UniProtKB/Swiss-Prot annotation:
Keywords: Activator, Developmental protein, DNA-binding, Homeobox, Nucleus, Phosphoprotein, Transcription, Transcription regulation, Ubl conjugation. Residues 185-215 are annotated as: Interaction with DNA. The modification Phosphoserine is found at residues 60, 281. This is Homeobox protein CDX-2. It comes from Mus musculus. The lineage of its organism: Eukaryota, Metazoa, Chordata, Craniata, Vertebrata. The keyword Mitochondrion does not apply.
C-alpha cells in the first residue's frame, strides 16, 4: 500500500518506468535511469563490450534472471580487460603454483630497466635475480609451487643463507683496532707563555681555589679558555700536594735516624810538649851581672849589698 502511494505521488521520479494500474506487480518495471555522467562516455568501451560478447558466446549461459532487474553480475570479471580470456587463464595458472606476475607478462625491474633505459642511466647496476624473484614470489597467493618451496628453504634456519639484495646488505665493518683511538693518543699539551704562568701563579698564591667569576676574567685577560684555566689550577694543586708529601717523607726519615755527637777538639799529648824558658825579672838579671854577690841577698835598705873589696 505504501509503495502504491509513493508511485502515485510522484511519477516524474521514474521517467523510464512502465506503470501498470493493477496490483503491485513490479516485475515489468525497469528503474534504470539514463547515465548521469556524460563525461565518462569518452573512454574506450568497445574492447570491453567485444570481450563480453565473446565470453557470452563461448561460455554456457548462467541461470535466468528476471528482466526487470537487468543482467546478472558475471563472475568472470577479468574478461573486461584487454585480452580477457588469455589474462584469466594466466591468472588461474599463476594461482595454481606458478608466478602470476610472470604469467601475466610482467617483467622484473632489472629487465624493465634494461629495456626502457638502455642509455640514460648506464651506471646503475641491475638488481640481482634472487632479489627480483623473491619480490615476485610474494605475489603468489595460491598453494606453494617449486619456486616457493625453494624460497621457504632459504628462509628456514636449517637451510642455506638467504640471498639479499645489494642495497639491503650491510656494509662490511673494518676491524675496530685500526679505527679506535685511545684517550692518550688524542691528548695535546698546552704550552703556556711566561706571562700566562706568572699571572696564574699570582692568582694561585692569592687563592688556591679560583672562583667562577675570577676564572672567566682571567681567561679573557690571558687569552685562554675557562677549561684551560681550571685544568691549570687542578694540576697546580696536585703539584703542591706532591711537594708537601715529599717534604714530609724527608722529615720522617731524618727523625728515624739516630743523632750523631758533635765533634770534640783534639787534646795535645804530654811527650810532645817542649820546656819553654821563663823570662828573667830585672832584679835577677842585675844580681847576676855583679861579681861576688850572693843572689837573693838584699841589704837593710832593700838595696843590693856592695861586695867587699880586698886590698
Amino acid at each position: 500500500m505504501y509503495v502504491s502511494y509513493l508511485l502515485d505521488k510522484d511519477v516524474s521520479m521514474y521517467p523510464s518506468s512502465v506503470r501498470h494500474s493493477g496490483g503491485l506487480n513490479l516485475a515489468p518495471q525497469n528503474f534504470v535511469s539514463p547515465p548521469q555522467y556524460p563525461d565518462y562516455g569518452g573512454y574506450h568501451v568497445a574492447a570491453a563490450a567485444a570481450a563480453t560478447a565473446n565470453l557470452d558466446s563461448a561460455q554456457s549461459p548462467g541461470p535466468s534472471w528476471p528482466t526487470a532487474y537487468g543482467a546478472p553480475l558475471r563472475e568472470d570479471w577479468n574478461g573486461y580487460a584487454p585480452g580477457g580470456a588469455a589474462a584469466a587463464n594466466a591468472v588461474a595458472h599463476g594461482l595454481n603454483g606458478g608466478s602470476p606476475a610472470a604469467a601475466m607478462g610482467y617483467s622484473s625491474p632489472a629487465e624493465y630497466h634494461a629495456h626502457h633505459h638502455p642509455h640514460h642511466h648506464p651506471h646503475h647496476p641491475a638488481a640481482s635475480p634472487s632479489c627480483a624473484s623473491g619480490l615476485l614470489q610474494t605475489l603468489n597467493l595460491g598453494p606453494p609451487g617449486p619456486a616457493a618451496t625453494a624460497a621457504a628453504e632459504q628462509l628456514s634456519p636449517s637451510g642455506q643463507r638467504r640471498n639479499l639484495c645489494e642495497w639491503m646488505r650491510k656494509p662490511a665493518q673494518q676491524s675496530l683496532g685500526s679505527q679506535v683511538k685511545t684517550r692518550t693518543k688524542d691528548k695535546y699539551r698546552v704550552v703556556y707563555t711566561d706571562h700566562q704562568r706568572l699571572e696564574l701563579e699570582k692568582e694561585f698564591h692569592f687563592s688556591r681555589y679560583i672562583t667562577i667569576r675570577r676564572k672567566s676574567e682571567l681567561a679573557a685577560t690571558l687569552g685562554l679558555s675557562e677549561r684551560q684555566v681550571k685544568i691549570w689550577f687542578q694540576n697546580r694543586r696536585a703539584k703542591e700536594r706532591k711537594i708537601k708529601k715529599k717534604q714530609q717523607q724527608q722529615q720522617q726519615q731524618q727523625q728515624q735516624q739516630p743523632p750523631q755527637p758533635p765533634p770534640q777538639p783534639s787534646q795535645p799529648q804530654p811527650g810532645a810538649l817542649r820546656s819553654v824558658p821563663e823570662p828573667l825579672s830585672p832584679v835577677t838579671s842585675l844580681q847576676g851581672s855583679v861579681p861576688g854577690s850572693v843572689p837573693g841577698v838584699l841589704g837593710p835598705a832593700g838595696g843590693v849589698l856592695n861586695s867587699t873589696v880586698t886590698q
